[in-house]
């Protein structure tokens, strides 16, 4: 079971009714099911903040020391790394619960990117959600090899939902 808490701090998000707990749960489940050790955990929790440029800028400055608005920020609750994901998940064998972390999405940046890239807002949001969940479970794109692995997973999951590759 995946428990999703959503905080909407910006009214524009309400225009996109498809972006809801059900969608977020479905996407999260589709990411996690690809990794065997997650099936041992009975309950996951994920916190979502749907916000605007001003708040994402503040968060980016506060937590990453970057003075720029961004599309999404991921705050993992665990020190996971996909290179040793299975050994790191061994501590979860005896746990029924895992808080994956927090994700903050910026409406204006995602909206502008979706227009520039000629995608629907919802499809771009889904891509950013998949990308963020992968970050929460230890994936990153700090080098070309890791970026290629992460992008391949994103493409695979997006295709499951009928969304073309963004790359």
Swiss-Prot record:
| UniProt EC number | 3.1.-.-
Q: Where does Zn(2+) bind?
A: 131, 135, 141
One GO term of the biological process aspect: rRNA processing
Gene Ontology CC: cytoplasm
Please give the Gene Ontology molecular function terms for this protein: metalloendopeptidase activity; RNA endonuclease activity; zinc ion binding
Cofactor(s) it depends on: Zn(2+)
Q: Name one Pfam family in it.
A: YbeY
* Co-factor note (free text): Binds 1 zinc ion.
Keyword Repeat assigned to the entry: answer is: no
UniProt-listed PROSITE patterns: UPF0054
Q: Tell me where it mainly resides.
A: cytoplasm
InterPro entries, A to Z: MetalPrtase_cat_dom_sf_prd (IPR023091), YbeY (IPR002036), YbeY_CS (IPR020549)
Localization terms from the record: Cytoplasm
Which purpose does this protein serve, as stated in its record? Single strand-specific metallo-endoribonuclease involved in late-stage 70S ribosome quality control and in maturation of the 3' terminus of the 16S rRNA.
Entry similarity comment: Belongs to the endoribonuclease YbeY family.
Task: Give the protein name, as stated in the record.
Answer: Endoribonuclease YbeY
Provide the species name.
Answer: Rickettsia typhi (strain ATCC VR-144 / Wilmington)
């Amino acid at each position: 079971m995946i428990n999703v808490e959503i905080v909407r701090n910006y009214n524009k998000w309400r225009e996109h009714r498809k972006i809801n707990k059900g969608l977020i749960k479905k996407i999260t489940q589709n990411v996690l099911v690809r990794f065997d050790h997650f099936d041992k955990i009975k309950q996951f929790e994920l916190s979502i903040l749907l916000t605007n440029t001003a708040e994402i800028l503040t968060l980016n400055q506060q937590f990453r020391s970057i003075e720029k608005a961004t599309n999404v920020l991921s705050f993992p609750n665990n020190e996971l790394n996909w290179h040793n994901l299975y050994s790191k998940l061994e501590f979860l064998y005896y746990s029924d619960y895992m808080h994956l972390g927090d994700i903050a999405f910026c409406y204006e940046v995602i909206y502008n990117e979706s227009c520039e890239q000629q995608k629907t807002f919802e499809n771009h949001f889904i891509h950013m959600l998949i990308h963020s969940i992968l970050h929460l479970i230890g994936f990153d794109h700090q080098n070309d090899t890791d970026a290629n692995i992460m992008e391949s997973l994103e493409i695979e999951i997006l295709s499951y939902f009928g969304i073309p590759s963004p790359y």
